Structure formats: C-alpha cells, structure tokens
Amino acid sequence: MRLVFVGPPGAGKGTQAKLLCDKWGIPQIATGDMLRAAKATGQLPADLVAQMALGVLVPDEVVVGLIATRSLEADARAGFLLDGFPRTVPQAKALDALLSSRGQALDAVLALEVPRELLLERAVLRRTDKRTGQIYHLKYKPPPPDAELEHRADDQEEVVRTRVETYEQMTTELLPYYEERGLLRRINGVGGVEEITSRILATLPTLPTLPAP
C-alpha cells in the first residue's frame, strides 16, 4: 500500500494519517519531519540549512533522495503513506520515476477537502497547553481550567489564511495530474474522526494491495 495524503492545513490530515498507518502497519513518511531530522543530524549541507532558515524551499532532488532512503527501510516494505510530498507536478513526476525504477507505483492519492472558513475556525480557536503539548479547541474540545494555554503563531488567522491559499495554489495542477491517472480519491473532511476514516476506507475497496481487516 503506497499512498500520498494531501490536504490543507487544519484539515485533520495528521489525525487520519496516524489512524490509517496504524491500521495497515505502514509508516507515515512526513517530509517536514525528515528534513528537520536530516538538519539536526548534519546530513544537509550548511548552505541548504541557511536557505531553509530563510524559508526557501528545499530542492526537489534533496527531498526525493530522503524519501528514496526512508522508503527502503524495513518498516516500509509493505508500503508507506507520504505526507507533505509531492506538492507540485514536477515533484509528482520525480516520485513516479523513483517508484518506477523499483517496479512500483502509487496505489492512491487521498485528498482531504474542507471548506476554507471551517479551516480558519478550526485553527483560530485552537490552543496548545504549554506544559503538556496537548492541543485543545475552544469550541470543539475545551481545555481544563488548569491548562496553560498559548495561541501558536501558525494558528493566527492571517497565517492560516495564507497557508491555505498557498496550498490551493500549489495543488491547482497536482490534483488534476493524479485525477487523470485514476489515482485521486477526494474525501469530504467535514465530520467526526471515525466518520471521515470510514469515508477514506470506502474509497479504497478495489485496491489489489489493500490488506485484509
């Protein structure tokens, strides 16, 4: 089972990715985490680290190289779920080439879709407990009275709005690319966690590599 999972910030992608990976026994390969780990262990050249600090996007070949290495590890033999990559058509083609060189291919691309205004509401009312790291929502998951709450910078309305717009711009061509290949599964991301998980699973019954329950 080789999957790509895409969705705007605040769509609940992280929650669903963990549930799916636990169900199928495959790793979640998050490119952001890989880059941070590579930076921390000195695997990236100093000039690239400096560019990352300025917000410059990491070259595709660097990310593909990290994915190539990670996807060969023992826990990824049965497949993996890619989170955060690809974001553009050139990246998608690079991923296709990598998998093709191994005689492999993607099984599906899951696109979690949530209306923009709901994304903003989810993020703007989200709070983090500074002591425990636990995430709460002032409307949907109120914190206990003793929580030491902070409103993270990346949950501010203008920041979230910009991130959502960036996601929409980047996927304008990416989603049609996968749709033309019959790989795209559009998932309604509005509802409870279990409800959304059921929708995802319902889009995948015909995949030949889908593990038995």
Give the location of each predicted region.
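Glycine-rich phosphate-binding loop of ATP-dependent small-molecule kinases
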Residues: M1-P213
